A protein has these predicted regions:
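Positively charged, small/polar-rich N-terminal and surface patches that mediate targeting and assembly
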Residues: 1-152
Length: 152
């Protein structure tokens, strides 16, 4: 079991920016569940919410036993550009994987070194930097990563 992350090479991200974007991609499958407040218990003090407990998450047995309790294996690949990165989306969808559940598109808010490629519904400029997959069985991960080279 391994997690595949594919980052865009054409953006020429600094090492720090690249690391941050890959970290966002790695954590996305967990943080997507943590952000669902309907599933959280709340801690109240004087009638006000002072904390959330987002850890009532449901994590697939194989992911928990082989990845979270294991060695957190990751493969970081490079995409030449946005179009090649989007090919990973097509491959994933062809394998029956779903965006927002099995893979996550990471878009930078362009507050530091990147220029916006698009503007979101809130008027915030964003640039697609990478795609992160939840931990996948090695054979599925390989079907995605074999089309990309390791990030150099």
């Amino acid at each position: 079991m391994r997690q595949v992350i594919i980052a865009r090479k054409d953006l020429n991200m600094s090492p720090g920016k690249l690391a941050a974007q890959c970290c966002h991609a790695s954590l996305a499958f967990l943080t997507s569940q943590m952000r669902d407040r309907s599933q959280m218990s709340k801690l109240y003090r004087d009638g006000e919410v002072v904390a959330y407990n987002p850890f009532g998450m449901i994590i697939e047995k194989d992911i928990y036993e082989e990845w979270i309790s294991g060695i957190f294996t990751k493969t970081i690949c490079e995409a030449r550009n946005r179009n090649q990165l989007m090919k990973a989306v097509s491959i994933a969808q062809g394998l029956g994987l779903k965006e927002g559940i099995d893979f996550f598109l990471i878009k930078d808010s362009c507050l530091t070194e990147l220029e916006p490629e698009e503007v979101d519904e809130n008027g915030v400029g964003r640039t697609l930097t990478c795609i992160g997959f939840k931990p996948l069985p090695d054979d599925i991960a390989h079907q995605i990563s074999k089309k990309f080279q390791l990030y150099k």
